[in-house]
Structure formats: structure tokens, C-alpha cells
């Protein structure tokens, strides 16, 4: 044990123990082995130190060179070379000692005193521990013990004969160590690595081919071991020279020796390199250089002949690798952990190992096994201990590096070490052969072949097993190296094996190249890198993209938005710039103003601040904005800044505006409200008074903007993000606003109304400003009541409004927010329109004026979730006002359309200006859109009035842009100043967001209208549609009821949807500007004002039909035909639009008219977005008949479906293609929403239009109403009252508008359910849909009542019935599609779907088209939709409303269907986008959609606005 101690000293001194401790059990064992080796070194000290010095100095040419090369005896292959030289005098030279270690042991050189004793004891220790130490040695001298077992046949039969003897000894010491196990013991240190290492050797060294080669090698090795065959020497020379032939001829001996020498040469190079370069460099150098040299210089150098051997060996190895790739790769997979590999290795070990065990054991035992083992093991162990101390440091570094697991593998991986041992031996032998030439290399080789081969033979049990092929040593080495490579890859075996299978040839090449180890080191790391590079980048890529898409554009837009601008001249260009950037900049500016105003209002009335807090940018929105990270918050800032501006404006009208107006902010807001009221009211009124008022309010507006652009605006944005806080505050503000707002708003509103009333008096001369002020106060109170569900519930939806109002109050967190948003979207819109119908009718202007004042607060309100709730409520109020405006406006409108429009314009203008919510309020009040549109229409005679109002807005607040005028008003100087041009596109979306949010209860209708708005954005097809559909809908949910949670949910949903949908988050980002279109509703208002200009005729028709809803619905049916037959966008259409908004706001919101069922909303989305093109086409084909109207609808839809492509194109496509009901449910819902808007606007819209306007106007509008009603149907979604009108026109549609709206929201939500990303929102939306459904079920009579009066519109009783709604909700899209298909009121939707199911749709059209049947134009349009495949495309486009969801669902469900739909939609989208005028009209229609929502809320301005939008979109 002195040797063990010495070896332990050497091992510890040389780091052998530590390195060998790669397998910790090799530590002590390797210490034993190191002691043994050291004792052997001591025994061979006289001889060994010189060779050690020689080897170290000479790179360990033979004996010790392999030892450094392969920490253990692997370096002894030169020792076998030395053995060949000195096997005769094996005990004399260091190489002889090394050779005695190697072959002297095979010869029985018991030079050391540890032949049998230390063999047994130390090597027994080496067997259990010493073999692990040999494993450690195999690690440090892997070619010694493990490779000693493997290579000891060649290098020093030291472990192997020793192991053969030692097999007896080891079997004595370790009964588990059979001869085959001894190789494993050498490999395994006889403990953990017995079977595993032997298996490792068998696997690494012995592949199935190697097994046969191992047998051959055993046979050859037997002669070699028994004799130092000169023939084998010559074979070896021949192998060196002609390895390809001789190695195979040599088979086991020659090949083993050759591969052995070759490996030794390779690893001697490696050892030299390793000794010189500390193994790591050498490994790399040798692997790259020598491997390449060996691989490529096979035939060139002596190593070239080695390389030939290596190549032949490689070829054999290729065979083996083929097996390896098959079996061995499997085994390699097991090799990941050698204990598991042991199972595989013992198989081979058992196979060829048993053969080799007997043969090798007997042979190795019969040779000087005990002497050789003990002595050579001693000498070799000494050498090893000495050189291992050096070489193991380096080589085990190399081995630890190559076999990074080898130190750990040394237990299980002595085969690897044997491989290393063997390869270093072979490499050293080859190097020594190169060094010695062939002379003593041959003799050494033969001796080494005899001894090392005997050793290898014993190891050939497993090693030759492994390398059974002709070149068993090389096969062994390569088998082992290959397995080592595999084992090195074992860490990455899962990767490397596959890569191995891929790179088997490459690996074979690499493997035969010098050192497999180094090939392993190099090759495996490469593979690892590849694997690592492959997977993480993909994952990281998506993660980065998702986050980047979510945040980049938002951040960029936020960055682009100069929040530092306190004062911004809201020129049309700047508004366009802002709108393009995002609503953010102008929104922030407005919010700064608002915050300044809010600061005033907060300073003056805390109730205002409370109210302002929900809408307050400072309190409520600013924290949420920061809370909502830029990804969600910023995009939603973009979305909701406009919508918040608008929604917050209406909410602030109801909330902040009332409160702010109640205080200094009210004074400021009074100016501001006057400003907004003036711009809106002034456009509705005369230009002069408008200009006068605008001048004052413009200054105030600038003031407010200056203030708002400051920090408070960003706080407002933060508050926008802080939806939960905003929502809670919104609820608080609702409570406080309900209580204090009515008072505060009343008195400050009186102030503001004083100025605004004066303004209004100027603006709206025909309208009684006092009553307007009273109405405005009432509307303010009603808006406060908006927060108070029952305060302003003047109509049936009031219960629903109460519920809806209560729903927005529901705090429930994010999910609840989703639920609330969803539920509030439908229910709140119902409740809101019913809620404030009368008060907002008269107070709409007041609210509008106040909205002007709180337009800055509007942002606050919109920013707040409470504002969303308020927005919903205010939307509901708008619907209530819409209903009341049906009552009030018919009087006004009937009295004088101009005056009515002026009133509406004043109301809408202030409301829209104040807030999107105000715009929603007005829009929801059928007055609002007329106000939004009518001020233009009334004062300007339609376009002029719109332009006047718009010009007023331009002059005062906005660059004069008809489209942006309303945006300007809606933004209350803050919203639209930056968003006039793009906001126009986005305004419809914002209208979809906020106006639709109340109409759509911020969820489905919002999504539908948002989709429509998005659909309008042909250019923003994916972006706008997606954001409008995902974000807008969700933003409705968020903006209306839960800005905080739903924004998050929208963002979360959108982001996830974007990511699943091939980065529709790019659309998300793009749609963030579409979300930016939150202002878009304002622009849509402006566009609606433009449309109001077109609404002139609509204004004319508005007054009478508003009250006679059924009558108007009659007219809608009749006049719808006319309008469809005639120009869909005639003044009558505009009037019809105007009235459609009013009626639809009341009915649709309340009843959630069957638009959803009818797919009127998708159609409406299409119509809304396509309204310009579609209504355009309808206008021309309207007269032509159903086909022409269908074509126009189709084309318009195609155009608008461009923007609506996601939402609308998809829903119709979903209607037809949307076979998976649940999958298509949401999308189908979106389609229903769009078609509901179309049909609801077409029918309910035309009905509402008829209600608002005279029957003729309504008829015209209804003709356009098919598309325009569809456009309005998003409103009708939210506007049950409006749909009630629409349902009177098409009772089924009314029912379906309510039920379908509920289902539309439901379907939209279900569509979200379809979306993987929308799961949470789908849950919430589904719950919200159920709630909305129940809410809609609470108010189903609302629409049915309205439709009942209309004989033309046979309201399908189930359409609005709870049963039908329940079925819709339950069936979701299927029920919705059934409704859409089955109910004629779903004409447009069914038309969309009918195009795919014409018979269905025809029946449905007949059913859902009672109004349409009565409304020839729209009915024809429905039928055209049914019959016209263009309209089918439009239906597909109509399904585009949830196109982003469709795209998501594309990924999530019915991919083929969605793909087809998407293809069709995209084609149509492309067509729509290609159609510039269509795109412009689409954008206009999108804006018009917003305006239509407003108009639906207010007047059903949509048809007029459609026409106007068509014109203006063309213009724009």
C-alpha cells in the first residue's frame, strides 16, 4: 500500500485524486490506484522517472507520453511501444516500466512489489476504489485502468491482465467484477462502473460491429497477447502504412493495436498537446487539427497512415456509428447516465463481453496477468501516478473536458477513460510509433498488441466487444471514443444523439480524427451550442416579440407623443399626426388640460375630483396607466386615450364633467365645455355663434390642453392603466357622482351650461337653450344617474341600466372587470341608453356641453374604469337618451330636423367633445350622433353643418376637418387635437370603443363596433381590426366598465392573441394606434358630422320618425327598400342613420337587438366599416335592388372588411365557414355583431332612422340601413332601443339585436373564448355574456315592444326572448349563427352566412328581414347578401369583425376553416385595401361606425353618415 499511498500522494499531488474524484469514489480508489501507480512508479522509479521525464519532456513519447496523454495508461500505449521496445527489458526503461505497466504486465513484469498483493489490495482497492481510481486513472489515466482494461491489453495488460488476474483478484476482491466486469471495473473502478463502464466500453468501444470485432480482436489479440506477432507488427506497420487494409487484416490486434496506436498517436498528440497545452487546448487543437489531420491527412502522413487506420477505423466506426446511431444512440441515451448505460453496456458486455471475458480473461490471466497487472499496474500506476499527476491534471482536464462527465463517468465511464486510455495509448503508440518509427513501434506494438492487446483483450471483453470490428483497437477507441463522444454528448445526449444521428458520418469522421475525446469536446459542444442556440432563440424570439410588440409600439408611440407639449394647436395635420402616432399625444395633452382642469375641478369640488378620479387622469387614470405597463397600458392608452377621452368625456360629462363643471374645472370646463359645446354646438348651430363660442372655448381649450399636456395627463394615462383603481374610483365616483354629480354637475353644469347654453343658444338657435340647459343639467344628472343606475332610467332599459350601472360598479378584479366589461358592454349599453334616454335627450346638449368641459376630464373618466362604467352607463344613458330622443328628438326632429339636428349637434358636439362617453352619450342618445352629426347637418345643412361644426372644432379645437371635428369635440379639445385625421378612422373605433362600449356594453358591441371601426380602417385592417376587435372590444369592456382590468385583459388577450396569431400583436401595435382610435370615435363623430352634412336629408326625415318608432320602422322597411334601391347614402339615408342611431341606441342597446343573432353586427361591422363602400355600393345598388345593394354591401364590406377584415370578414366567413360553433362563436359573434350592426342598422337602423327621420329618410337610410344598420348594429348591439326601432323594422332583428347583441357580445366573448389568449377574457366574457344575456333577457321586451308595433318587422319572439338569448348564449356562435341564419332580422348576418348557406340565409332573410322585406333596399341587400357571393365575401368580411380573433382562432380552433376564411377575408381585405376609395370609405365607415354608434345612440345617423362617410371616406 506504499504504492497506493505514494500513488495517493502522486494522485493528490498531481490532482489525480481530485481529477479522479470526478468520480469521487475514484478519489480514494484512485488514490489507491495512484498509490499503486506511484508504487509502480516507485518500483519502476529507476526506470520510470526517466521515461516520465522523457514522456513529459518528450511529450511522453511512449510509456509516459501516453500517460500524460491519457491521464492513465492511455499514455502507456507508448508504454506498450516502449513495451515493444522494452518488453524484453520491460523493467529497465521508463518506457519499459511504462511498457511493463503496459505490456510488461502482460508479460508478467512484476517489477513492482504490488503484483498480486497490491494488485489484490491496491488494485483490489483499485477494483472497488482503485479501479475507480483507475477510472480516475482512466480519467486521469483513462487509458490505463478503464482503458487499461480497454487498452491495457495493448498498453499495459496492467489492469487488463491484472484485471484478468485481477478479474480473479477483482472477482475475488469484487465478485461482481467478471472478466467483462473487470473491464467495467477498470472502467467502473469495479464499483459503480463495473457493468456500466464495461457497458460503456462495450458501447463506446464495442458496438455491435465492435463486438464481432471484439471477437476478432480477441482472436487477434490472443495471438497478439500470446505472441508479439511480427506479423501483427508488420500488420501494425502495414496498418500504419496501409491502415485500411491491414487494420482490417489485423482485425483485433492490428486494428486494435492500430486503433490503439492510432488512438495513442492521436492522443499522444493530444497528450503532447495536452501536456503542452494542458489538455484543453490540446483537445481543441488536436481535435481540430489532429482530427482534421487524421480525418483528412489519413493517406498523407505516418499519422496519415494512422489516419488511414483512423479512417478505416472510422469506416468501421461509421458502421459502428450506424449501429451506434441506432443501437448505440439508444444506448447513448442510456449512456447519459452510465448506470443506465450499464444496462445497455452489459448487453454488449454480455454479448461480446462474455466471449472476451473467457478468452480475454483466460488469455489475460494466462499471460503475466498477476505479474503484469501487479507490476505493470504498479509501474503503470506509478507512471500513471506520476504522469497522471501531470497528465491526469491535464488529461483529466482533457478527459474531464472531453468527458466532462468522465470524472463522473469514471465511475460509470471508465470505458470513456478506457477509451481515453486506449486512445492515448494508441495515440501515444502512434505518436511513439511516429517517434520511434515503425521499428520498435512494431515490436512495441506487437508487444503492446500482445500486452496492451491482452489488456485490451481483457478489455476487449467489453472494448473489443465494442470495437469488435477488424480494427478492434481503433474500433475500440472509436467505439469508446464514439461512445465517449456520445458520453460527452451524454450530458446533451438527447441532443447529441439526435445530432449524432444527423452527424453520424460527421461524427465518424470526427471520431476517427485523432481523438474522439476531442472530437467529442469539439463536436459535442458544437452540437450543444446548436441545440442551445436553436431552442432558446426561438423561445426568446417569441418572448421578445411578444413583449416588444406589446410594448415597442406603445412605448414608441408614447415616446413619439410629446407629453411635454402643454399647448398643442390641434390642427388637422397635428391631429392626424397624433392620431397616427397614437391618440396618446393629443390625448395626453388633452389630459394635461383635463388634469389642469381636473386640478381645478379637483381643487374646487372633490366630488368632481372623485368623479374626475374615475375619469380623473390625475387620480384614477395616472396610477392605472403606470400600473398598466406600457405594453398593455400604452396600447390601451392609445386605444383608450381617445376612447377614454371620449368615454371619459361622456363619463366626465356624467362624472367628471358634471363634477368638474360643478367646480373650477366646471368653469374651466365650462369654457372648455363651452368650447367643446361651442365647437360641437356651434357646428350644429351657425358658424358665427359656433365661431364665437369656439373662440372663447378655444382659448379655454388651449388652457385646458396646456394644463392637460402636463404631468397630470400622464398620470391620467397611468390612471388609464390602473383600471382596477379607476374602476373602483369609477364606482366611487359613480356613487359620489351619482350623488354629488347631479348636484355639482347641475350647478357647475348650470355654469357651464350658462356659457354653454349661451353657446348653445348661439350654436343651436332653433333649440331652446334653456331646455337644452335643463336637459343638459338633466343629462348631467342623468349621467350622474348613469352612475346611479336608476337615477335616469326613464325608459325600460332602466332596469337593465340599473343592473348595468350596477354591473359597472362590480369591482370584481380583472376577471370581474372582464365580466363587467363584457356584461357591462351589453347590459350597460342597454341600461345606459335606456338610462339617459330622456334626460340625455334634453340634457344631452348640456351633457355635451359639459362633455366639452370635461372633455379633458373625459380623458380622466375614460382613463378610469369608473369612467368605463360611466361610459357604459353614459352610453346607456345615451341609449336611454336615444330612446328618449326618440321621444324627445322626434319632437325636436319632427319639429325641425335642422333644429333637432342642431340640438343633437349641440348635445352631441359637447358630449362628443367632452368625452367619447359624451359622444357616446349623445351618440347613445339618438341625439348624440345627430348632435355629432346634426350640428353639422342642421347648421351646415348636413355637410355644411358638419363642416361648420367641424370647422368650429378645427378653428377652436381641431384643424377644421369634418371628420375630426367631432373627434375634436369628443376629445373636448384634448381628445382630437392630435387625432383628427387618423382619429377619424380611429374615431369610429373609439366610437366602437366607448360609444360602442355603452352601446355594446363596452364588450361585444364595442368589439363589434370596434371591429367595424377597425374594419373601417382598411389600412389598419389587422391593426385596427385587431385592436378594435380585441382591444376595442376589450377596451370597451375596459373603457366602459373596467378600464383597469379590461385594458389589461385586452392587452393580455391581445398580446397573447397577437402572439398566437403570428404576431397580430404587430397588429396590436398597429392597432394600438387603432386603439389610439379611441379618439377615432371622435373623428368618427367628426366624420359623423360630415355625415351629418350628408345627414341633411336625414335630418329632414329624423324629426318625425323618431317618435313613431314602429312607424319609422315601417318606414325603415319601406324606406329601407327605397334607400337601398336609391342611393343608400342619400340625405334620407343620413337622416335614417341619424334616426337609426337614435332608435338603435334605445332599442339595440336595450334589447341587444337580434343584430347579434342576425349577424347584423358583423354585417354592421362590415356595413359600419364598409358603410362608405358598402353603403356606397348599396346607395347605387340600393336602387338597383338587392343584388346591387348586396354588391355595394359586399364591396363596402370588402372595403370596410379590410379594416373589419378580422372582425367582419371573419364573422360572415365564420357564419358560413364558422361550422365549429364554439370555435367560431366569438368570431361568429363578431360577425353577428357586425351583421347585427348591418342588419340592425339596415333594419333597426333604418327603423331607427325612420324613427329619427321621416319614413322616407328612414327608408332611404334603411336601404343603406342594411349596411348602415349593420354599421349601427354595433350600436344596436349596445342599443337595444335602437334595435327596438330596427326591430320594428325587422322585429327579429330587434330581438336579435338584443339577444343577438348579447350573443354578439357573447359570441365575441366566445370568440375570445376561442382564442387561447382570450381564455381568461373568454371566461370573464362568457360570464359577462351570461350576465349580459340575463340583462338583455331582462330587457327583451324593449326591442320586441318596439318591433311589435312595426308590422313589417315581425320581431321574432324568441329573438329577444330570454329563451332565445339563453339559446344564443348557450349555443354562442352556433345559436347565434342559427339566429343569424334562422331569423330574418339577421338578414345581413345571414346574408353573410347565407352566402355560404343561401337557403338558410334566405329563410333567415325572410325571417330576419321582415323589416328588410319591408325595407326593399336593405331586404334586397340582405338577399343580395344571401344571393350575392360578393356579399358572401362581405359576409366573410363581415366576419372580419373578429378577424384577429379569427386569426387567433385560426391558431386555436378550426384552423382550416379559419384559414379559408382568413384567406377569403384577406383576399377581400386586400381587395378592400386595394380599393382606395373603399378603403377611405372603409376608414370613414369605421369612423362612421363610431359615428354611427353615436348616431345610433343619437339619431341613427349611420345611413346618412354612411353616405356621407362613403363620400368622405372617398374624399378622405
Curated annotation (Swiss-Prot):
Gene: NEXMIF
Ranges of compositional bias, category Basic and acidic residues: 380-405, 1456-1479
Biased composition (Basic residues): 1443-1453
Alphabetized InterPro entries for the sequence: DUF4683 (IPR032757), Nexmif (IPR042794)
Keywords: Chromosomal rearrangement, Cytoplasm, Developmental protein, Disease variant, Intellectual disability, Neurogenesis, Nucleus, Transcription, Transcription regulation
Primary role: Involved in neurite outgrowth by regulating cell-cell adhesion via the N-cadherin signaling pathway. May act by regulating expression of protein-coding genes, such as N-cadherins and integrin beta-1 (ITGB1).
Subcellular location: Nucleus; Cytoplasm
Name of the protein this chain belongs to: Neurite extension and migration factor
Region (Disordered): 380-440, 589-610, 1158-1225, 1373-1419, 1437-1479
Reported disease: Intellectual developmental disorder, X-linked 98: A disorder characterized by significantly below average general intellectual functioning associated with impairments in adaptive behavior and manifested during the developmental period. XLID98 patients show delayed psychomotor development, absent or poor speech development, and postnatal growth retardation, often with microcephaly. Some patients show autistic behavioral features, such as stereotypic hand movements and repetitive behaviors.
Polar residues bias (residue ranges): 596-610, 1158-1170, 1185-1194
One Gene Ontology cellular component: nucleoplasm
GO terms, biological process: negative regulation of cell adhesion mediated by integrin; negative regulation of cell-cell adhesion mediated by cadherin; negative regulation of cell-matrix adhesion; negative regulation of neuron migration; nervous system development
Tissues showing expression: Highly expressed in fetal and adult brain, predominantly in the cerebral cortex and the cerebellum. Also expressed in other tissues but to a lesser extent.
A Pfam family annotated for this UniProt entry: DUF4683
Source superkingdom: Eukaryota
Predominant localisation class: nucleus
Amino acid at each position: 500500500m506504499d504504492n497506493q499511498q505514494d500513488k495517493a500522494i502522486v494522485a493528490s499531488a498531481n490532482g489525480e485524486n481530485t481529477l479522479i474524484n470526478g468520480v469521487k469514489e475514484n478519489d480514494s480508489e484512485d488514490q489507491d490506484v495512484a498509490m499503486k501507480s506511484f508504487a509502480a512508479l516507485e518500483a519502476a522509479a529507476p526506470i520510470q522517472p526517466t521515461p516520465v521525464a522523457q514522456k513529459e519532456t518528450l511529450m511522453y513519447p511512449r510509456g509516459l507520453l501516453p500517460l500524460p496523454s491519457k491521464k492513465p495508461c492511455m499514455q502507456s500505449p507508448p508504454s506498450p511501444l516502449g513495451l515493444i521496445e522494452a518488453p524484453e527489458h520491460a523493467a529497465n526503461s521508463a518506457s519499459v516500466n511504462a511498457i511493463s505497466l503496459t505490456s510488461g504486465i502482460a508479460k508478467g513484469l512484476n517489477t513492482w512489489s504490488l503484483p498480486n498483493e497490491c494488485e489484490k489490495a491496491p488494485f483490489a482497492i483499485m477494483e472497488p476504489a482503485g479501479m475507480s481510481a483507475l477510472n480516475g486513472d482512466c480519467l486521469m489515466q483513462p487509458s490505463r485502468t478503464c482503458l487499461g482494461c480497454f487498452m491495457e491489453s495493448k498498453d499495459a495488460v496492467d489492469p487488463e491482465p491484472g484485471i484478468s488476474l485481477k478479474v480473479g483478484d477483482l472477482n475475488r476482491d469484487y465478485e461482481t467484477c467478471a472478466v467483462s466486469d473487470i473491464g467495467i471495473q477498470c472502467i467502473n473502478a469495479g464499483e459503480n462502473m463495473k457493468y456500466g463502464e464495461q457497458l460503456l466500453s462495450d458501447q463506446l468501444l464495442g458496438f455491435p460491429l465492435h463486438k464481432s470485432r471484439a471477437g476478432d480482436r480477441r482472436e487477434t489479440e490472443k495471438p497478439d497477447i500470446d505472441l508479439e506477432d511480427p506479423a501483427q507488427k508488420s500488420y501494425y506497420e502495414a496498418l500504419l502504412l496501409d491502415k485500411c487494409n491491414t487494420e482490417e487484416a489485423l482485425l483485433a490486434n492490428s486494428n486494435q493495436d492500430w486503433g490503439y496506436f492510432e488512438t495513442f498517436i492521436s492522443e499522444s498528440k493530444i497528450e503532447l498537446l495536452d501536456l503542452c497545452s494542458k489538455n484543453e487546448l490540446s483537445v481543441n487543437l488536436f481535435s481540430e487539427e489532429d482530427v482534421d489531420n487524421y480525418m483528412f491527412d489519413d493517406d498523407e502522413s505516418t499519422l496519415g497512415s494512422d489516419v488511414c487506420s483512423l479512417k478505416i477505423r472510422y469506416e468501421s466506426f461509421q458502421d459502428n456509428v450506424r449501429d451506434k446511431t441506432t443501437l448505440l444512440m439508444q444506448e447513448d441515451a442510456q449512456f447519459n447516465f452510465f448506470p443506465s448505460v450499464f444496462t445497455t453496456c452489459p448487453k454488449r458486455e454480455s454479448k461480446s463481453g462474455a466471449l472476451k471475458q473467457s478468452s480475454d480473461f483466460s488469455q489475460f490471466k494466462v499471460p503475466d496477468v498477476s505479474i503484469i497487472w501487479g507490476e505493470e499496474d504498479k509501474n503503470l500506476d506509478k507512471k500513471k501516478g506520476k504522469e497522471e499527476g501531470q497528465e491526469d491534471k491535464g488529461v483529466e482536464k482533457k478527459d474531464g473536458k472531453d468527458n466532462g462527465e468522465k470524472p463522473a463517468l469514471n465511475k460509470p465511464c471508465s470505458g470513456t477513460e478506457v477509451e481515453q486510455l486506449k486512445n492515448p495509448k494508441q495515440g501515444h503508440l502512434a505518436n511513439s510509433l511516429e517517434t520511434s518509427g515503425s521499428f520498435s513501434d512494431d515490436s512495441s506494438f506487437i508487444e503492446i498488441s500482445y500486452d496492451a492487446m491482452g489488456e485490451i483483450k481483457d478489455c476487449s471483453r467489453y472494448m473489443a466487444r465494442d470495437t469488435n470490428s477488424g480494427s478492434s483497437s481503433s474500433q475500440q477507441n472509436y467505439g469508446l471514443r464514439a461512445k465517449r463522444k456520445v458520453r460527452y454528448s451524454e450530458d446533451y445526449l438527447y441532443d447529441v444523439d439526435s445530432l449524432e444521428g444527423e452527424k453520424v458520418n460527421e461524427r465518424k469522421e470526427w471520431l476517427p480524427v485523432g481523438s474522439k475525446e476531442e472530437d467529442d469536446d469539439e463536436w459535442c459542444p458544437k452540437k450543444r451550442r446548436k441545440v442551445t442556440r436553436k431552442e432558446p432563440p426561438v423561445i426568446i424570439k417569441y418572448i421578445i416579440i411578444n413583449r416588444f410588440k406589446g410594448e415597442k409600439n406603445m412605448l414608441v408611440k408614447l415616446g413619439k407623443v410629446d407629453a411635454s407639449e402643454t399647448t398643442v394647436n390641434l390642427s388637422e395635420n397635428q391631429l392626424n399626426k397624433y392620431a397616427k402616432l397614437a391618440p396618446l399625444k393629443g390625448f395626453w395633452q388633452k389630459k394635461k388640460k383635463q388634469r389642469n382642469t381636473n386640478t381645478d375641478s379637483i381643487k374646487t369640488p372633490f366630488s368632481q375630483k372623485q368623479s374626475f378620479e374615475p375619469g380623473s387622469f390625475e387620480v384614477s387614470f395616472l396610477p392605472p396607466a403606470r400600473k398598466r405597463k406600457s405594453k398593455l397600458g400604452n396600447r390601451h392608452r392609445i386605444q383608450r386615450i381617445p376612447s377614454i377621452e371620449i368615454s371619459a368625456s361622456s363619463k366626465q360629462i356624467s362624472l367628471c364633467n358634471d363634477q368638474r363643471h360643478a367646480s373650477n374645472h366646471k368653469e374651466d370646463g365650462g369654457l372648455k365645455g363651452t368650447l367643446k359645446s361651442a365647437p360641437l354646438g356651434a357646428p350644429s348651430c351657425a358658424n358665427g355663434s359656433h365661431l364665437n363660442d369656439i373662440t372663447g372655448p378655444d382659448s379655454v381649450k388651449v388652457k385646458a390642453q396646456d394644463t392637460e399636456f402636463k404631468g397630470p395627463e400622464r398620470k391620467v394615462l397611468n390612471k388609464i392603466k390602473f383600471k382596477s383603481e379607476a374602476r373602483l374610483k369609477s364606482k366611487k365616483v359613480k356613487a359620489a357622482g351619482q350623488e354629488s354629480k347631479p348636484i355639482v354637475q347641475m350647478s357647475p353644469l348650470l355654469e357651464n351650461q350658462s356659457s354653454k347654453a349661451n353657446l348653445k343658444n348661439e350654436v343651436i338657435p332653433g333649440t331652446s337653450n334653456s331646455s337644452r340647459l335643463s336637459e343638459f343639467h338633466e343629462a348631467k344628472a342623468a349621467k350622474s344617474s348613469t352612475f346611479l343606475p336608476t337615477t335616469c332610467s326613464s325608459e325600460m332599459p332602466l332596469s337593465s341600466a340599473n343592473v348595468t350601472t350596477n354591473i359597472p360598479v362590480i369591482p370584481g378584479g380583472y376577471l370581474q372587470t372582464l365580466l363587467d366589461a363584457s356584461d357591462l358592454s351589453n347590459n350597460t349599453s342597454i341600461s345606459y341608453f335606456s338610462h339617459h334616454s330622456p334626460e340625455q335627450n334634453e340634457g344631452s346638449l348640456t351633457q355635451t356641453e359639459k362633455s366639452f368641459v370635461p372633455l379633458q376630464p373625459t380623458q380622466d373618466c375614460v382613463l378610469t374604469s369608473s369612467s368605463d362604467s360611466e361610459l357604459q352607463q353614459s352610453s346607456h344613458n345615451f341609449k336611454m337618451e336615444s330612446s328618449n330622443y326618440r321621444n324627445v328628438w322626434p319632437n325636436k326632429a319632427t319639429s325641425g330636423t335642422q333644429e333637432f339636428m342642431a340640438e343633437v349637434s349641440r348635445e352631441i358636439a359637447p358630449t362628443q367633445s367632452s368625452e367619447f362617453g359624451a359622444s357616446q352619450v349623445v351618440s347613445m342618445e339618438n341625439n348624440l350622433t345627430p348632435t355629432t352629426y346634426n350640428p353639422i347637418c342642421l347648421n351646415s345643412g348636413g355637410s355644411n353643418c358638419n363642416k361648420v361644426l367641424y370647422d368650429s372644432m378645427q378653428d377652436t379645437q381641431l384643424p377644421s376637418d369634418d371628420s375630426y371635428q367631432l373627434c375634436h369635440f369628443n376629445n373636448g379639445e384634448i381628445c382630437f387635437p392630435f387625432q383628427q385625421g387618423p382619429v377619424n378612422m380611429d374615431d369610429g373605433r373609439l366610437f366602437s370603443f366607448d360609444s360602442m362600449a355603452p352601446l355594446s356594453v363596452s364588450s361585444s358591441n364595442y368589439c363589434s363596433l370596434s371591429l367595424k371601426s377597425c374594419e373601417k380602417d382598411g389600412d389598419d385592417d389587422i391593426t385596427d381590426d385587431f385592436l378594435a376587435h380585441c382591444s376595442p372590444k376589450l377596451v370597451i369592456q375596459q373603457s366602459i366598465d373596467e378600464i383597469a382590468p379590461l385594458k389589461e385583459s385586452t392587452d393580455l388577450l391581445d398580446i397573447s392573441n397577437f402572439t398566437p396569431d403570428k404576431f397580430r400583436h404587430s397588429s396590436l401595435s398597429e392597432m394600438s394606434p387603432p386603439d389610439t382610435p379611441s379618439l377615432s370615435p371622435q373623428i368618427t363623430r367628426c366624420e359623423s358630422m360630415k355625415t351629418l352634412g350628408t345627414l341633411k336629408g336625414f335630418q329632414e326625415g329624423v324629426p318625425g320618425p323618431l317618435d313613431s318608432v314602429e312607424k319609422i320602422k315601417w318606414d325603415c322597411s319601406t324606406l329601407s327598400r327605397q334607400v337601398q334601391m336609391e342611393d343608400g347614402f342619400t340625405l334620407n339615408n343620413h337622416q335614417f342613420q341619424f334616426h337609426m342611431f337614435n332608435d338603435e341606441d334605445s332599442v339595440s342597446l336595450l334589447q341587444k337587438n337580434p343584430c347579434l343573432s342576425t349577424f347584423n353586427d358583423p354585417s354592421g361591422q362590415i356595413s359600419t366599416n364598409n358603410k362608405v363602400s358598402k353603403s356606397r355600393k348599396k346607395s347605387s345598388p340600393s336602387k338597383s335592388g338587392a343584388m346591387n345593394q348586396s354588391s355595394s354591401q359586399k364591396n363596402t364590406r370588402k372595403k370596410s372588411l379590410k379594416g373589419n377584415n378580422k372582425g367582419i370578414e371573419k364573422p360572415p366567413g365564420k357564419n358560413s365557414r364558422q361550422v365549429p360553433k364554439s370555435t367560431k362563436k366569438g368570431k361568429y359573434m363578431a360577425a353577428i355583431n357586425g351583421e347585427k350592426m348591418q342588419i340592425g342598422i339596415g333594419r333597426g337602423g333604418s327603423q331607427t332612422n325612420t324613427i329619427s327621420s321621416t319614413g322616407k329618410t328612414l327608408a332611404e337610410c334603411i336601404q343603406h340601413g342594411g349596411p348602415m344598420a349593420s354599421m349601427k348594429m354595433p350600436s344596436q348591439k349596445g342599443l337595444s332601443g335602437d334595435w327596438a326601432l330596427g326591430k320594428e323594422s325587422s322585429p327579429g332583428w330587434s330581438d336579435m339585436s338584443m339577444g343577438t347583441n348579447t350573443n354578439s357580445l357573447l359570441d365575441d366573448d366566445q370568440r375570445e373564448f376561442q382564442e387561447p389568449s382570450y381564455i381568461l377574457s373568454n371566461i370573464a366574457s362568457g360570464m359577462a355574456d351570461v350576465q349580459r344575456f340575463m340583462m338583455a333577457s331582462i330587457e327583451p321586451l324593449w326591442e320586441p315592444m318596439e318591433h311589435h308595433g312595426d308590422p313589417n318587422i315581425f320581431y321574432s319572439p324568441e329573438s329577444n326572448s330570454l329563451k332565445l338569448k339563453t339559446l344564443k348564449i348557450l349555443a354562442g356562435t352556433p345559436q347565434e349563427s342559427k339566429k343569424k341564419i334562422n331569423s330574418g332580422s339577421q338578414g345581413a348576418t345571414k346574408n353573410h352566412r347565407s352566402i355560404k348557406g343561401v337557403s338558410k340565409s334566405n329563410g333567415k332573410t325572410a325571417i330576419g328581414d321582415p323589416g328588410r322585406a319591408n325595407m326593399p333596399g336593405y331586404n334586397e341587400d340582405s338577399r343580395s347578401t344571401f344571393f350575392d357571393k360578393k356579399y358572401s365575401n362581405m359576409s366573410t368580411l363581415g366576419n372580419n369583425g373578429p378577424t384577429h380573433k379569427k386569426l387567433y382562432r385560426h391558431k386555436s380552433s378550426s384552423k382550416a376553416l379559419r384559414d379559408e376564411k382568413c384567406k377569403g377575408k384577406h383576399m377581400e381585405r386586400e381587395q378592400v385595401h386595394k380599393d382606395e376609395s373603399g378603403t377611405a370609405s372603409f376608414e370613414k365607415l369605421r369612423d362612421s361606425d363610431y359615428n354611427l354608434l353615436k348616431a345610433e345612440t343619437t339619431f341613427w345617423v349611420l345611413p346618412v353618415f354612411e353616405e356621407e362617410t362613403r363620400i368622405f371616406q372617398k374624399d378622405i
